[in-house]
Amino acid sequence: MVWSRTNQLIAAAAEGLGARAEPLGREHTDYFMRLSLGERRAIVSKTRSPFLTQVAQGLANNKHLSRELLRARGLPCAEGVLVDESGDIHGPAVRELLARHGRLVVKPNWGNRGVGVATDVRDLATLARARDRARGLDLDEEVLVEPFIAGTNLRVAVIGGQAVAAAEVVRPKLQVGRSAEAQVAALNGDPRRGTWSAPSLCPMDQIEAEEDLAGHLEVYGLELEAPIPAGREVEITGEELEVIDRTDEVHPEWLAVAASACDLLGVDVGGVDLRGPMAAFAGPPASAAGAALLLEVNVVPALHLHALPTQGRARPVFAAFVAYCLQLPGAPPPCAVVGV
């Protein structure tokens, strides 16, 4: 039996707390695990706690609706236009967004792990291709179009209503003049990248070029084997180049924004994505003046980013997760009531 990286980290954290982590049934499944300590028991699904409701998970997964609700409660959320299966990607709302910002991001409204997300979309032809790809990957064929926000991808981990860690996630960008295939091969030579077939505690994963990158490149009119042309910036969404711990550099009010977003959506264990200049996160949200914004709340929050950063201090997020799920003394109480 081989646990995934996430479950290996959960099991190690449980052991460190004197608890047990064991399979739920006779046949191995990586999706469920039983935690126990004395009379305390909890069944978890990766980093989903036993207190998460289906309503809260579904609400958080709907990026457009959850953002609308959070914005109505005063949180600094990015704007966006929802295009459903009958909507026109070239409609006036999207055209106005493109004219006003010049660069857009297109993503599945119910997306996960950055799959189907196209950044740096600058023209209508690319916009249409990005729409088609995102729609095909979305649960309800819905596409979210939003402005491209320059700056840093900041992920904040929230456990039991408390923001416990923050990390800058640097995405790989393909360089001009070399093929995507060659550049991905070079990236995969990094010993810090592990494989899905043999899970380890490597902080990053191998990039499967044929699995998702080929379709991603088609959005920009590019191919895996062809050199990246001048003037084109292609970010490999959903992958990491570096993960830098920023917990001690983020202003407490931004951490409070992340915790509030989770609380309002009923998400007790979440990863909140913020984006903007790193300098904006050093001060309170009011001082950022729209330069930094909240993008989304993720229900399966990739806690390994904080436990295994490539730079900076590792944070004990899995110990906090286990303690919360088992409701050990000192852990925050369950908080999975939708409050918007």
What kind of feature is each model-predicted range?
Residues 235-249, 263-269, 276-340:
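C-terminal active-site "lid" helix and adjoining low-complexity regulatory extension at the edge
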Residues 21-44, 225-232:
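Short, composition-biased local secondary-structure segments
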Residues 23, 155, 273:
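Short, surface-exposed charged micro-motifs
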Residues 42-47, 53-201, 252-255:
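Active-site nucleotide/adenylate-binding loops and adjacent lid/helix of ATP-dependent enzymes
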Residues 1-33, 200-217:
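N-terminal-biased segments
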Residues 32-42, 154-159, 163-165, 280-305:
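A short beta-strand motif that forms the metal-chelation/ATP-contact edge
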Residues 150, 158-260, 264, 303-314, ...:
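ATP-dependent carboxylate/phosphate-activation module, predominantly the ATP-grasp catalytic core
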